[in-house]
Structure formats: structure tokens, C-alpha cells
């Protein structure tokens, strides 16, 4: 594990200087889930909410959130993203929706925070749209699955930790 890069030698917060780093292709994949009552999941899948198609609204919210990370997380760089994709996998056996986000760019810094934020905001949007029916939903297991590009190389979460 390396040093914490967001602090200087005196412990003061700082934005990492990436001026001298080359722009390379960066990809990050994150996942998370929202667990709910079976009736809530069924209604989502039937597109039965008056507010609209819950998963499509969550997809748009996740994409928008990925594009605004530098305004949400204080020391994140402003990055020109080239792709943001969200996928939703309903899991009726566990009464949940698994959310996956893939974010790409060509930049001197990675897009892990953008992928994690996309997943988180998509889950929050599902919660918001369904809370009138189910206030016991649980958002969890938000994690980085994979990242590539840059100095730190290629990271892939162990298979047993991906679920």
C-alpha cells in the first residue's frame, strides 16, 4: 500500500499534481446493490411506478453524477470522460438490483471515483423513486471491481469478492 497522496509532508490536504503524468486510456468498473422487498422489485421490473421507468432514470442519474465528481469530492480532478455505461441486473432470488458502472477516459488520472459515484447515485435514485412503497431498502456493497491504465497498473478484484 502506498503513501496517502492527498496530504503533503505537513499533513495538509492537497490536490495531487498530475501535470507531468502522461494522458493514458483509463477504465474503471464499479458495482453496488440495492436490496428491497420482493413487491418493490416486481413493480420496478413491471415499470409500474408513476414517476417513470425507475432503472432508466437511475441510469441517467448515474451518468450525470459521474460527470460531476470534481464538484462533489473535494480533491478529485476535473476529467473529460469519454464513456459512462450503467447496467442493472435484477436478482429476484435475493430481492435486489445489482448496479454496475464502467467509466472511460484518456487522462493523466484515473476514473475510479467516477465509477463509484455513478453506482452510488444510481442506487440513491432507485431509493428515492421507490421510497413511498419501501422505506426499508438497503444500499450496499459499493466497490471497485476493476481499473486499468496509469502507473499503478491493472487491478481486478478477486472473484470471491466480486459478488
UniProtKB/Swiss-Prot annotation:
Can you state which reaction this protein catalyses? Answer: (8S)-3',8-cyclo-7,8-dihydroguanosine 5'-triphosphate = cyclic pyranopterin phosphate + diphosphate
| Gene3D superfamilies (alphabetical) | Molybdopterin cofactor biosynthesis C (MoaC) domain (3.30.70.640)
Which enzyme type, at the first EC level? lyase
Catalytic residues in the record: 128
- InterPro entries with a match to the protein in the record: MoaC, MoaC_bact/euk, MoaC_sf, MoCo_biosynth_MoaA/MoaC, Mopterin_CF_biosynth-C_dom
What keywords are assigned to this protein? Lyase, Molybdenum cofactor biosynthesis
* Entry EC no(s): 4.6.1.17
Please name one Pfam family that this protein belongs to: MoaC
Q: Which GO terms describe its biological process?
A: Mo-molybdopterin cofactor biosynthetic process
Q: Kindly list the positions annotated as binding substrate.
A: 75-77, 113-114
Pathway(s) where this gene product acts: Cofactor biosynthesis; molybdopterin biosynthesis
> Which N-terminal residues, if any, form the signal peptide?
none
* GO terms for MF: cyclic pyranopterin monophosphate synthase activity
Its quaternary structure?
Homohexamer; trimer of dimers.
Family listed: Belongs to the MoaC family.
Q: Which HAMAP family match?
A: MoaC_B (MF_01224_B)
What functional role does this protein have? Catalyzes the conversion of (8S)-3',8-cyclo-7,8-dihydroguanosine 5'-triphosphate to cyclic pyranopterin monophosphate (cPMP).
Q: What is this protein called?
A: Cyclic pyranopterin monophosphate synthase
Give the gene that encodes this protein: moaC
Amino acid at each position: 500500500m502506498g503513501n496517502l497522496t492527498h496530504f503533503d509532508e505537513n499533513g495538509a490536504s492537497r490536490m495531487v499534481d498530475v501535470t507531468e503524468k502522461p494522458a493514458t486510456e483509463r477504465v474503471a468498473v464499479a458495482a453496488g446493490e440495492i436490496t428491497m422487498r420482493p413487491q418493490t422489485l416486481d413493480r420496478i421490473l413491471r415499470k409500474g411506478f408513476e414517476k417513470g421507468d425507475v432503472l432508466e432514470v437511475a441510469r441517467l442519474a448515474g451518468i450525470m453524477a459521474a460527470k460531476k465528481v470534481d464538484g462533489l469530492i473535494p480533491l478529485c480532478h476535473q476529467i473529460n470522460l469519454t464513456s459512462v455505461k450503467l447496467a442493472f441486473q435484477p436478482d429476484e432470488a435475493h430481492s435486489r438490483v445489482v448496479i454496475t458502472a464502467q467509466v472511460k477516459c484518456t487522462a493523466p488520472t484515473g476514473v475510479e471515483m467516477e465509477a463509484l459515484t455513478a453506482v452510488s447515485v444510481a442506487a440513491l435514485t432507485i431509493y428515492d423513486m421507490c421510497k413511498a412503497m419501501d422505506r426499508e431498502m438497503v444500499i450496499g456493497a459499493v466497490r471497485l471491481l476493476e481499473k486499468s491504465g496509469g502507473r499503478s497498473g491493472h487491478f481486478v478484484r478477486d472473484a470471491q469478492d466480486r459478488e
